[in-house]
Each structure stands twice: as structure tokens, then as C-alpha cells.
């Protein structure tokens, strides 16, 4: 059993003195793991977010298998001095490692992650919007798309200021004001991202409001269902 693909490193764990278990998010094979040998330049080659050419081989598809890797690009040095960006990319990698099913392609999510890495690498000011879009897309790809297009009660598309924590659907101000303490806020930034307006810049506080909402649904639909702890790094993004 053998395949070749490109992939982004989302986790790396030492296995003995001379080996590493790599977890890759690949373009055509989804999340895959494999054993690879440590080399003199391993610290540089096997950083989170690095893009690799990978050749995987094993006797059976369900085996861990072996990975031969060739570095295509190492973007981490572009943003490692920016604490928020570094935490963001490592946090999202951890999320993918924990919730993505094995061997199921998610090509759209993969392409968007590659694009997001380019966005932060080139210091695009709208990178936070692109990140929220990634988390929304992850929910969608795994079958939990939020419906933020109209009010769940009345169907109106204006003045959407809340989100139901039970259904993941938008609620208008007129309806939601009566039980606002039981609803999540619907930040303007998240509204724009949902409607594919990713170019605006917002305050960090607005970004954190968006993170609280997407984080709530990531935890509810994915982590709690898998009985897996929500990543501490993701929580750290709310306290910076």
C-alpha cells in the first residue's frame, strides 16, 4: 500500500530516539499519520504548518505506515515572533489533529488552510477574518454548518444580533431581546465572515467575540461528542 501527496504538518511526536510520528493534513488523503526518521535538520523540517511532499507506505491501509518527506515550504519563521499568530496556527493544528477523521479528504478545508497560512505569512491585516472563516468551514465540513443567514423564528435577514446556542441559527434583535441572556451574541465581524466579506479589519475584542461563538460550537459539536478536551491554546486566544 503506497500513496504520494502534499500535506501540512499538524502534529509531531517523538517515538524513541531516532523516529517521529507525524500527523499530516493532506490534500487528497485527509488526516494521515506515519513514522519518519529524525535527521540533523528535523527541528526545521518538521515544524507545525510546514508543507511537505509525503510518500506513505505500509503493508495494510490500517497500519501506521512509514513516511518519506521532502520539505516544500517552511512558513513558520514568517510569524513565529508574533505570539497571537503563532498560537493561532498551532491551536488550529491541534484542533484538526483531535477532530478530523482519519483518511477522509477535506479538500476545501485543506485549500483554505493553505490560503490562510499565506495570508498570515504576508501579514495581511484581515487574517483574523480568514481564521474565523476556517473555524466555520471546519464545522461545515464535519456536518455542523451554522445557519446565520436569517432569523430562525421570523425569517427576516436584518438586525440579526444573536445566535441560538441550541440550534446554531441566527436570531433577530426584536425576537432575541426577550431572552438575550440565553443567547450568544452575533458579532458584526462574524456576520461579515459568514457572508464572505473577509477584507475588513476589526478590533481584537471583536475578533475574540467571534472566537467565543465559533469555539462554543466547536466544543459542543466536536470535542464534547468525541469526549476530548478543548485545546488550552485555543482558550488562550481569548485571554491575550
From Swiss-Prot:
SUPFAM superfamilies: ArfGap/RecO-like zinc finger (SSF57863)
Keywords, ordered alphabetically: DNA damage, DNA recombination, DNA repair
InterPro entries, per database record: ARFGAP/RecO (IPR037278), DNA_rep/recomb_RecO_N (IPR022572), NA-bd_OB-fold (IPR012340), RecO (IPR003717), RecO_C (IPR042242)
Database matches in Pfam families: RecO_C, RecO_N
Domain of life: Bacteria
Annotated coiled-coil segments of the chain: none
Keyword DNA repair attributed: yes
GO BP term, example: double-strand break repair
Any Gene Ontology CC annotation: bacterial nucleoid
The keyword Heme belongs to this UniProt entry's keyword annotation: no
Family note: Belongs to the RecO family.
UniProt function note: Involved in DNA repair and RecF pathway recombination.
Family matches, as HAMAP family: RecO
Protein name stated in the entry: DNA repair protein RecO
Gene designation per UniProt: recO
Amino acid at each position: 500500500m503506497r500513496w504520494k501527496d502534499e500535506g501540512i504538518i499538524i502534529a509531531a511526536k517523538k517515538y524513541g530516539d531516532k523516529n517521529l510520528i507525524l500527523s499530516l493534513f493532506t490534500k487528497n488523503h485527509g488526516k494521515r499519520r506515519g513514522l519518519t526518521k529524525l535527521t540533523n535538520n528535523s527541528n526545521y523540517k518538521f515544524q507545525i504548518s510546514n508543507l511537505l511532499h509525503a510518500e506513505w507506505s505500509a503493508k495494510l491501509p490500517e497500519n501506521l505506515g512509514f513516511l518519506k518527506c521532502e520539505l516544500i515550504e517552511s512558513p513558520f519563521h514568517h510569524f513565529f515572533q508574533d505570539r497571537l499568530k503563532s498560537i493561532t496556527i498551532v491551536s488550529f493544528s491541534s484542533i484538526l489533529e483531535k477532530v478530523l477523521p482519519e483518511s477522509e479528504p477535506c479538500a476545501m478545508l485543506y485549500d483554505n488552510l493553505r490560503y490562510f497560512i499565506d495570508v498570515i505569512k504576508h501579514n495581511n491585516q484581515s487574517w483574523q477574518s480568514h481564521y474565523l472563516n476556517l473555524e466555520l468551514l471546519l464545522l461545515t465540513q464535519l456536518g455542523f454548518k451554522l445557519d446565520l443567514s436569517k432569523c430562525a423564528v421570523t425569517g427576516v435577514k436584518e438586525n440579526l444580533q444573536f445566535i441560538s446556542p441550541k440550534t446554531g441559527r441566527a436570531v433577530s434583535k426584536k425576537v432575541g431581546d426577550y431572552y438575550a441572556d440565553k443567547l450568544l451574541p452575533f458579532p458584526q465581524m462574524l456576520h461579515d465572515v459568514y457572508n464572505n466579506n473577509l477584507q475588513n479589519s476589526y478590533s481584537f475584542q471583536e475578533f475574540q467575540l467571534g472566537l467565543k461563538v465559533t469555539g462554543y460550537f466547536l466544543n459542543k459539536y466536536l470535542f464534547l461528542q468525541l469526549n476530548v478536551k478543548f485545546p488550552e491554546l485555543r482558550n488562550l486566544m481569548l485571554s491575550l
